[in-house]
Amino acid sequence: KDGPYPTVWTPASSTWIKLLNAQLAAKDKPELINGTPESLMVTPVVFAMPKPMAEALGWPKKPIGWKTLAALAANPQGWAAYNHPEWGQFTLGKTHPELSTSGLAGTIGEFYAATGTTSDLKTTDLTNPKTQQIVKTIESAVTHYGDTTLTFLNNQLKSDQETKTPYVSAVIVEEKSVIDYNKGNPTGKMDATNLTPPRTPLVAVQPSEGTLYSDNPYAILKAPWVTPEQTEGAK
């Protein structure tokens, strides 16, 4: 326990609420969310790529998806296959799926793309050898596996300012983070001043197979420590 118990939980995605409910159900415990949470804002989870790299893959005219990245990751020529040997191998930045919304959404997106389905994933989908091979190929390109996207974007901006080689070829982030980065504000601080935009901007590429959204739910907790007055006040 760190501080007072919360009355409201606002995770970046409703996916975390579903995971919590599943864990509670497995222990025969009641759900902690009161009603259906409202969404405060919505932003898609995208591939953030240095603009020249995205253009080399055909952006914005040609669709780019998880399978595009898998094929590039598996190609021993790396970026040389797209006439840019100076960029080396394709590298991916991705946060830990147990700690970060974009990392979780990215992992789910990989499996959806690998199976080609848009309906609920089944255990047989996840254990399919072909599916697992595609996901493993994508994950093999992950050279930086951090805790938050802010770490990646800070390092990307530092690399942009100091060298001509991008920190990573692509990083999985929320679209809003791309907007902030291109302003020279990779941490997204509301009161940031004296910003210097990057020399090479990032572009937000929505996976052609489809993407998940961070819906930022406002969830009022239905817990023993929450009083009726607190519940009413939180509404």
What are these regions (language model features)?
Residues 1-89, 96-99:
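N-terminal segment of the mature folded domain
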Residues 3, 11, 41, 63, ...:
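Soluble non-cytosolic domains of exported or imported proteins
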Residues 11-13, 50-51, 94-97, 173-176, ...:
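Active-site-proximal beta-strand/loop segments in catalytic clefts of secreted hydrolases
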Residues 12-16, 20, 43, 65-69, ...:
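Stable alpha-helical elements in mature extracytoplasmic
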Residues 34-47, 132-142, 146, 192-231:
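Periplasmic-binding protein-like
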Residues 51-67, 215-235:
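Extended ligand-binding regions for polar small-molecule ligands
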Residues 59, 72-82, 87-103, 107-145:
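Short beta-strand->loop
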Residues 109-204:
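Ligand-binding pocket segment of bilobal, Venus flytrap-like solute-binding proteins
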